[in-house]
């Protein structure tokens, strides 16, 4: 069998092309199932690619990590059959075989690391020494699995390949240059590259951005972009164009080439011919594209962040956007809160999954008309990557420099036939994506500051704290907490400060209770809120005015208890009662609790 390392030292390595889009699986059947149900068909595909001139082929096992993560019975047999078929075909020509592993889902019950390692070890037992982890959108668990694999098989050659959109980001919002850098610096990855999603021309532009990765670089684009014809997805990229673009990459230093979706033996044969026509002496790595003159960073004069960073206690006030299309009363309420001394207006993103005026559009209007700092909430529930990026660019253009990244309340089960959850991100990955958009050559000259949510009332607060630490690692700057309406919430706030330190900016949540009915409702029907029984009892029999007075006193005491551990306060407006919030802000400033 071909020695991959020796070949790469001499010339570029040519992989096969797409399996799933070339082999037509039966409706409702995974392509990998054909390893057992149609072995001759899979063997014929391998042989066709080898006849086209491929130096290496992939096992027909792309979906195995997903099947293994689902603990689907029989994935081991699919691995065995996939390896045996590829090895049989490669044995006829002396080509290399790569055990092919697609993305593994990362769950709390079964981390991606364990899934990757289980599948890779299965292949290692069968004799695999070359491994391809491909079409990844993030590095979750893959490096840990490779380190463990190389303890068992130290001679293993491992190629890690990411699926990157033409703008340089994966579907999980990771920037390709950062992912490639992490692989190159890991010490356990032997080659790194890009595959799928993008067509040859776009992938060539991405490679020019990467430059010398420090490892052999791999490129396996799709044949083109998919079109739907007669209810079938087709790729119309021509073999001649595919070969021309990829042979240019080889001439520029890319050492591993092949194809992904839509590519066929005809594409690989054309590329083989083009590669064989290149001179023997080729660059060992691509040269970086000359950098354009760096644009000076444009920093917004952000009074809220400046005040927060200089140790003054800030006041953020949440005011839910309207349920209709009229912003008149909302803008008047925002003006009053600004005049009262609010440093920031926060706007929820369709709380409890009920549609309201878009939080980001409202934020832009408030910022434009009032010059007030705004913090629109941005959930992962309703937008995919494209919509999220488009919205962030619009916010930046409007001068909005802070967002609150949250996963978002799920849509009620009864409505899911008509309204769909998206959840392409979780809040940690969304934060990482937002931060990655800023930097030299990126979309934003200066970063948007990302805050997150922290539930002080979580039943398992240790888990909540671990997640908070992960959010900080992923680029968040601080947290807005759920309301402090219990003694335990204060204890947890203190623990948060001790655990996360001064780096995390914490705005303690304060939500005035205005009646016993209101308190009972929050305790029983609002996720993440706990109201001490003593507080509930104190509101018994009070009218509206009395309820507001008591709510004001309870809120002031909550801020006093939270103040030693908070950088400011996040005040939530109950039932649009602006006058109550004006009084609360005045009390906090008068008593020196907030600046």
Residue ranges of each PLM-predicted region?
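Domain-level signal for soluble alpha/beta catalytic cores
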Residues: 1-595
């Amino acid at each position: 069998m071909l020695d991959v390392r020796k070949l790469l030292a001499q010339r570029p390595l040519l992989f096969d092309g797409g399996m799933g889009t070339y082999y037509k699986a039966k409706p409702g059947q995974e392509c990998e199932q054909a390893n057992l149900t149609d072995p001759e068909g899979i063997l014929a595909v391998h042989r066709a690619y080898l006849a086209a001139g491929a130096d290496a082929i992939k096992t027909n096992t792309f979906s195995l990590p997903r099947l293994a993560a689902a603990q689907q019975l029989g994935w081991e047999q699919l691995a065995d059959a996939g390896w045996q078929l590829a090895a049989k075909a490669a044995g006829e020509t002396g080509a290399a075989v790569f055990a092919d592993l697609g993305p593994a889902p990362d769950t709390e019950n079964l981390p991606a690391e364990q899934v990757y390692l289980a599948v890779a070890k299965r292949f290692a037992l069968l004799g695999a020494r070359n491994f391809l982890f491909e079409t990844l959108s993030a590095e979750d668990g893959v490096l840990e699995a490779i380190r463990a694999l190389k303890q068992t098989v130290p001679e293993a050659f491992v190629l890690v390949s990411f699926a990157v959109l033409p703008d340089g980001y994966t579907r999980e919002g990771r920037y390709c240059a950062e992912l490639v850098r992490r692989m190159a610096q890991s010490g356990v990855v032997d080659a790194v590259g890009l595959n799928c999603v993008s067509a040859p021309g776009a992938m060539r532009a991405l490679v020019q951005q990467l430059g010398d990765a420090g490892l052999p670089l791999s490129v396996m684009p799709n044949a083109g972009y998919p079109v739907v014809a007669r209810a079938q997805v087709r790729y119309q990229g021509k073999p001649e164009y595919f070969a021309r673009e990829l042979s240019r990459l080889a001439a520029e230093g890319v050492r591993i080439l092949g194809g992904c979706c839509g590519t066929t033996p005809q594409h690989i044969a054309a590329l083989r011919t083009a590669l064989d026509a290149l001179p023997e002496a080729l660059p060992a790595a691509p040269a970086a594209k000359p950098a354009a003159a760096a644009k000076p960073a444009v920093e917004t004069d952000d009074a809220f962040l400046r005040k927060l960073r200089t140790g003054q206690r800030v006041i953020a006030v949440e005011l839910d956007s309207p349920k209709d299309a009229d912003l008149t009363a909302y803008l008047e309420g925002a003006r009053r809160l600004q005049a009262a001394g609010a440093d920031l207006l926060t706007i929820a993103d369709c709380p409890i999954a009920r549609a309201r005026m878009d939080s980001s559009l409202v934020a832009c209007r408030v910022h434009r008309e009032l010059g007030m700092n705004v913090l629109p909430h941005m959930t992962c529930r309703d937008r995919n990557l494209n919509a999220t990026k488009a919205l962030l660019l619009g916010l930046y253009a409007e001068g909005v420099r802070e967002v609150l990244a949250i996963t978002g309340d799920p849509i009620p089960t009864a409505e899911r036939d008509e309204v769909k959850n998206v959840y392409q991100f979780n809040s940690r990955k969304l934060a990482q994506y937002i931060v990655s958009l800023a930097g030299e050559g990126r979309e934003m000259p200066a970063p948007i500051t990302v805050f997150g949510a922290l539930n002080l009332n979580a039943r398992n607060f240790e888990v909540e704290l671990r997640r908070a630490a992960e959010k900080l690692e992923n680029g968040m700057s601080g947290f807005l907490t759920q309301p402090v309406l219990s003694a335990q919430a204060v204890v947890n706030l203190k623990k948060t400060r001790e655990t996360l330190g001064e780096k995390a900016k914490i705005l303690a949540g304060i939500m005035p209770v205005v009646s016993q009915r209101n308190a009972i409702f929050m305790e029983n029907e609002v996720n993440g809120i706990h109201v001490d029984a003593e507080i509930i009892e104190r509101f018994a029999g009070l009218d509206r005015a009395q309820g507001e007075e008591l709510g004001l006193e309870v809120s002031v005491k909550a801020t006093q208890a939270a103040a030693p551990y908070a950088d400011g306060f996040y005040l939530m407006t109950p039932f649009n009662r602006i006058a109550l919030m004006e009084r609360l802000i005045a009390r906090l400033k008068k008593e020196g609790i907030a600046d």
